[in-house]
Amino acid sequence: MLKMGVLLFTFLVLFPLTTLELDTDRPVERHAAIKQDLKPQERRGIRLHAPRDECCEPQWCDGACDCCS
């Protein structure tokens, strides 16, 4: 009887759990598929720059920093 219980538990509970596709894997795969289709130049353009708290003198302001007051 114990062997039958172990066999049923294995095939009715554990086997279906291993064959299920996890939902958390899908967004990563979709994101990777989208990024894979991009050209290298387009991939480089997607990078977001971290905000910086730098300031520079008004004559040196070129958009990379905020002008100091």
Curated annotation (Swiss-Prot):
Name the UniProt key words of this record, in alphabetical order: Disulfide bond, Gamma-carboxyglutamic acid, Hydroxylation, Neurotoxin, Secreted, Signal, Toxin
Q: Which residues form the propeptide?
A: 21-52
Question: Listed disulfide bonds for this chain?
Answer: C55-C67, C56-C65, C61-C68
Q: What is its main location?
A: secreted
Q: What does this protein do?
A: Iota-conotoxins bind to voltage-gated sodium channels and act as agonists by shifting the voltage-dependence of activation to more hyperpolarized levels. This toxin enhances tetrodotoxin-sensitive sodium current in rat dorsal root ganglion neurons.
Q: Which InterPro entries does its entry note?
A: Conotoxin
Q: Which GO terms describe its biological process?
A: envenomation resulting in positive regulation of voltage-gated sodium channel activity in another organism
Q: Which N-terminal stretch is annotated as signal sequence? A: 1-20
Record's family?
A: Belongs to the conotoxin M superfamily.
Q: Tell me the compartments it is located in.
A: Secreted
In this UniProt entry, the residues modified to 4-hydroxyproline are P58
Q: Which terms in the Gene Ontology molecular function aspect does this entry carry?
A: ion channel inhibitor activity; toxin activity
The organism of origin for this protein = Conus litteratus (Lettered cone)
- Put simply, this protein is called Iota-conotoxin LtIIIA
Q: What is known of its domains?
A: The cysteine framework is III (CC-C-C-CC). Classified in the M-1 branch, since 1 residue stands between the fourth and the fifth cysteine residues.
**Residue numbers bearing the 4-carboxyglutamate modification:** E54, E57
Q: What GO cellular component entries does it have? A: extracellular region
